[in-house]
Amino acid sequence: MKRYLVCAALAGLVITLSMVLQPPISYNGGLGWDGAQYTQLAGQCGREPMHAYEPFTYRVGAPCLAALVPLPPKLGLWTINILSSILLLFLLDAWLRQHVHLILVPYLLAGFAFHWLTPLRHVWWYPTSVDTPALCAIVGALLLTETPVAFAAVCLAGALIRESVLIVPLGALAGSFVRLAPPNLVAKAGRMRTSAIAGIAAGVAGMVIARLVSTPDTHYSLPDAAYYWALHKPPLAYLLAWFITFGPALAVLAAHWKAAAAFLAEFPEYAAMLVLVAILAWIGGSDTERFLLWGSPIILVMIGKAADRIDWRRARGLLAVLAIGLAISGRWFLIIPDYWPEAPRAWPLLTPWTAAHYELLFSHTPDQAMAAVALGEYVALSVVLVGWIKWHARS
């Protein structure tokens, strides 16, 4: 019961602060970019033929759920996103408790919940996205990997929301061929392979259903887009995106990388999923951080495994510096700014504190000089933290 109270209290606190402090985006009447297409689909579902720009037109799951809410389409999507963001916290709690020392779980959840990119914060700025229910489906699928029927059902529903959910069954299938050890693991690999095949089939079925019920207004070539970003995404911007998404907690992971590597060796399916996420984040588009967030359930476990190797009672100074760094980089107490391309430059301290344009927060910021400074700050802080952790381990 206590764990549920912690999740509820954390969700309530973040939601209350966001309601009071975070103004929603004003661009395109508050609908944003892809959100305008999802809002259009929500208004069409059950009333008229569904159509929107490609590839957004095939992500019909969340808009059709929003159509069931007796509110205008935008508010319906917002409602689905708020409920999904709360559900996600409970799902993450269940997921982390399977792999991480229980005492660390509330801290990992708090760091996730307060980060400006994660759903409990982000849906109050961008209410019409479908990423939040998709992330719920990803974590739900991770929890059900060895139960084929339930796993397939989640993959089917998830693929209707966003095709990214397929990273879970694809990773599970790859991992099932690597688990070649004791008989109990071989049996587990067989169950996982069955679930993975069922999940892939269900996910593909979901994508086919989406293409039968919704048609594109424009043409979009996924191979062309992937080819473009594979060639044109700057490597340093890609590295910065990892720091923006996960902050200086990556230093903990780097300092005790063997603990994280042991986890991935024990569960190769998660390693395969991370590889898929890393590739998609590179070739998927300019929103690198949004793609990396799909791997956050696994990254959080890896950070937890590494953090468990540190005696935090003897490293309170380290803990204080790390906590401050996480709060600053995650903008725990700073709002997400609106869309204002003409906004003045905002120099960063990990994050640009005074930024008045949301693009300045991302790795694809138009101000690449500012991005270079931010990356240098992240690297410098990480070097200090890794050295500090290593010193504590020796003392």
PLM region descriptions:
Residues 18-22, 30, 37, 171-174, ...:
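Membrane-lumen/periplasm interface segments of specific transmembrane helices
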Residues 79-100:
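Transmembrane-helix motifs of polytopic, lipid-linked glycan transferases
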